[in-house]
């Protein structure tokens, strides 16, 4: 074949590839995420990489709403559940994909004491403050507010939240940012930063609900979970940590060698659990004490679907990770595939300081969540996707 013919064929193939990419059916409709909420405009942004992977982000709650990655056959699959329009996000109480703050997880009785001053926070969960007092009807919690887009490029977006002193009862004027970057190795790199003008507490995380099965009507109980953690923090019947750090060995909390999530919880709820901790959490809703000891170069967790071959590894500079097995998904609203989001159709791996750290930081093995003026809060999480 002549050189000119080869070039012609190559050019035609390139054009076909471009056309195929342009004609790709979008997971979400941008227009369905454009509205005004609490006086601010919401929108939808798409991050892409060299491998045609995508991460879809809305500035409402600085949320990840879709993650498109290839399965073992090269077919693109959405790795997270969530709604397909902004109306559902702004009317149905949910944390799907959100940036949680000021303080992710629970604070006992919604009370913190800083320099002998008692601050009362919302008591929105069994008398405790959960996820910054999240309430879609007020709204409270950073996941229920519209963030400002500071910068956006092809593979990254930075969003900013200006939180006033006294918001949800928390002290200090806080400026917080989250940056999502989709790397060419199919990793989502998340960086949270914050500063304050008054001593306060900060604990930010991402609340994506993973389902790696491709078909999100299939529960995540078939997923294989590995947690690099020899210990966890037990909770009581109100989901509040007791202050104890307990070994996982010989308990359903042991995921050190990788285990099917449903092994100890499939088909069970509430009083049906024999294990006290599973009964207290209505399944898994606990914080694990990571062996990685805040080293974000070491794998903290791995989640794998045997159906698609997709896995996600988690790396973090935080000391803990909350594994939540979607125990309270009740079917309110349908997901992007039209499925009702019912119990255990998604699970969360939330990197974090330990729950109630503001009241337990003096206990052995616990960490402070205090942020002072002049300091910068920095938290890092990587969700590394792949197949096997």
Which residue stretches match the model-derived regions?
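Positively charged n-region of N-terminal signal peptides that target proteins for export
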Residues: 1-4
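Alpha-helical transmembrane segments and their juxtamembrane interfaces
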Residues: 12-13, 217
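An exposed, glycine/acidic-rich loop-and-rim segment of catalytic or binding clefts
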Residues: 19-53, 59-388
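Sec-dependent N-terminal signal peptides
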Residues: 6-10
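C-terminal motif of bacterial Sec signal peptides marking the signal peptidase cleavage site
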Residues: 15-17
């Amino acid at each position: 074949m002549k050189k000119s013919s080869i070039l012609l064929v190559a050019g035609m193939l390139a054009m076909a590839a471009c056309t195929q990419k342009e004609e790709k059916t979008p997971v979400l409709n941008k227009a369905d995420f454009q509205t005004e909420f609490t006086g601010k405009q919401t929108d939808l942004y798409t991050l892409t990489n060299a491998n045609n992977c995508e991460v879809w982000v809305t500035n409402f709650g600085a949320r990840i709403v879709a993650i498109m990655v290839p399965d073992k056959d090269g077919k693109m699959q959405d790795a997270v559940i969530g709604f397909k329009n902004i109306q559902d996000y702004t009317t149905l109480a949910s944390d799907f994909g959100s940036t949680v703050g000021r303080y992710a997880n629970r604070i006992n009785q919604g009370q913190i004491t800083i320099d002998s001053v008692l601050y009362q926070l919302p008591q929105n969960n069994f008398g405790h403050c959960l996820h910054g007092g999240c309430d879609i009807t007020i709204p409270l919690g950073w996941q229920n507010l519209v963030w400002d887009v500071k910068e956006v490029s092809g593979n990254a977006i930075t969003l900013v939240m200006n939180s006033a002193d006294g918001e949800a009862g928390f002290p200090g004027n806080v400026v917080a940012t989250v940056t999502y970057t989709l790397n060419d190795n199919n990793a989502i790199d998340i960086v949270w930063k914050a500063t304050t003008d008054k001593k306060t507490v900060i604990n930010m995380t991402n609340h994506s609900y993973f389902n790696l099965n491709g078909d999100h009507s299939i529960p995540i109980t078939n997923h294989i979970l590995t947690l690099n953690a020899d210990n966890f923090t037990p909770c009581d019947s109100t989901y509040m940590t007791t202050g104890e750090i307990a070994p996982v060995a010989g308990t359903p909390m042991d995921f050190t060698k990788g285990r099917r999530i449903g092994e100890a919880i499939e088909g069970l709820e509430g009083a049906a659990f024999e294990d006290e901790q599973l009964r207290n959490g209505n399944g898994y809703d606990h914080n694990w004490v990571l062996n990685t000891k805040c080293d974000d170069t070491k794998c903290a967790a791995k989640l794998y679907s045997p159906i698609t071959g997709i896995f996600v590894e988690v790396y973090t500079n935080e000391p803990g990770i909350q594994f939540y097995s979607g125990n309270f998904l009740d079917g309110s609203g349908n997901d992007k595939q039209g499925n009702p989001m019912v119990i255990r159709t998604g699970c969360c791996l939330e990197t974090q300081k330990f729950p109630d750290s503001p009241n337990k930081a003096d206990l052995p093995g616990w960490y402070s969540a205090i942020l002072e003026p002049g300091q910068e809060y920095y938290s890092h999480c990587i969700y590394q996707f792949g197949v096997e």
